[in-house]
Amino acid sequence: MHSVAVSAIGKDALGDTALRILDEKKLKYVMPVVDYPTGTVQVQLDKEGVPTYDIKQGVAWDNIPFTSDIREIAVNAGAVCWGSLAQRSEVSRKTIYTFLDHTPEDCLKIFDINLRQNFYTPEVITESLKRCNVLKINDEELITIGRLFGYPGLDIENKCWLILGKYNLDMLVLTCGVNGSYVFAPGVKSFQETPKVEVADTVGAGDSFTGTFCASILKGKSIQEAHELAVKVSAYVCTQNGAMPQIPEEYTR
């Protein structure tokens, strides 16, 4: 099993640096060079290590073309994960939808809703909910979705069951920070407490959770087993600086 990052970079030093870092970590990628600057994000951490983001606009990843190399990844994908942020521009949004249209019928399609600043609309969210079979969302995003779609009064579990049924999802993953996490599936509810750890920062914690959960499901683990491992890996990432620390072998066997 291997993963591939799909994006775009600019003809600039930042793009070169991004590829060098990915190469050093032996990560696979398909990132066409386009006539826009490589994307940047300014991250500020509060005293609890929780990040806020200033995400620059009009950058390379807003303009990802659907190339033959990207099509090749789509038609062979066992899983794909995308968010709402990458859909803020029409170009990349169309590429994402075209990618999804080329995936196999049994592909795990994970919509990590990833609400950032004001870079989302009800229409974009609805379209992705229709196209995914797994939703990953956090408790703050769930509140926002409840307000957007007219069910703010429901408690978190009932909101999750409602979304799961309305969009015919296979699974819904809800993370609630220090208050634990849930996985909902038809007839199944899994809850895991969040381990108490010394937090360096939480950048990358959500993505490591999603990636671990996805890989575990693809390997045939049960929802409960995948959930347990995802919680452990996410907690470990919180103890490290940066979004992509080396994961201990005990979690990758």
Predicted regions and their residues:
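Conserved beta-alpha-beta core of the PfkB/ribokinase-like small-molecule kinase fold
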Residues: 79, 83-158, 180
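Conserved phosphate-binding/catalytic region of the ribokinase-like
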Residues: 149, 153-253
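Short beta-strand/turn micro-motifs composed of small residues
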Residues: 7-10, 113, 176
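Conserved N-terminal subdomain of the carbohydrate kinase-like
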Residues: 2-84, 102-105, 253
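Residues that scaffold the ATP/ADP-binding catalytic core of kinase and kinase-like folds
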Residues: 54, 145-146, 237
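Structural alpha-helical scaffold elements that stabilize or flank donor/cofactor-binding regions
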Residues: 72-73, 127-128, 165
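Acidic, amphipathic alpha-helical patches
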Residues: 69-70, 125, 160, 199
